[in-house]
Amino acid sequence: MSLQEHRLSNGFRIVTENMPGLASASIGVWVAAGGRHETPQQNGIAHFLEHMAFKGTKRRTALQIAESIEDVGGYINAYTSREVTAYYARVLQNDVPLALDVIADILLNPTLEETEIEVERGVILQEIGQALDTPDDVIFDWLQEEAYPDHPMGRTILGASEGVSAFSRSDLQGFIQQHYGPEQMILSAAGAVDHDEIVKLAENLFGGMDAKPFADVAAARFMGGERRQIKALEQAHFALAFESPGYRDAQIYTACLLYTSDAADECVN
């Protein structure tokens, strides 16, 4: 294992692992700007921004963003969680500089055009409606809400229709301005990557960012609870959660092994 780390002068962090024998690489930037970093009024805005990621920048149209990666046989995507928003790509070794340039462009130069905002607003509202009609989605949102009541970790990632309907372009820009700083970002790359090359690319692309302080985030405390809903369905949907060690706890890997042995789908925080 050849894990290497570096931090730029503005706080931007880089973690790489060269994996011999591979001809491709996975690379991405993880931003500490997920659901838990939202205010109640902002609930859903991190996910909204993720939807806007590939809708155009000052240098590339939406089509150019897609074609730049697809034309070299690569894959690019993004996701939002309660902890982070991530932007990542998988490409061949020679296309790593291109992939990182596109990701940096998305992060640093989004145009957030009003027409695209309205299109994505409609898409997200449909997504919210579908989630509310899907018991598998509903029970896990309820689980979070009961585990962390009156806390950002207990809110949904998608947000509520009322809030999403009200987000403006300036709201999106304000969230970026507040949370998308170099110290809030980690560049992670694995596969056919050279650490020194990645550091040099990151310095050129992200080294000019101005540092900004972390926003205050309330500590999450597991509370627990119970919620039931009786509906006329043929199946019952059930979720049960327990407090577990955190990511930084020495017992986290033991806990993950236990979850795996119990046929759990994944190790969750």
What are these regions (language model features)?
Residues 1, 223-226:
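Short beta-strand-initiation
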Residues 1-22:
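N- or domain-start disorder-to-order transition segments that initiate the globular core
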Residues 7, 18, 62-221, 228-229, ...:
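Charge-rich, well-structured scaffold segments of protease-associated domains
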Residues 26-90, 261:
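M16/MPP (pitrilysin/insulinase) zinc-metallopeptidase core fold and M16-derived inactive scaffolds
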Residues 50-53, 123, 130, 268:
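Hydrophobic side chains within alpha-helical segments
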Residues 249:
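Short glycine/threonine-rich loop/turn motifs
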Residues 259-269:
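Single conserved hydrophobic/aromatic residue that forms the stacking wall/gate
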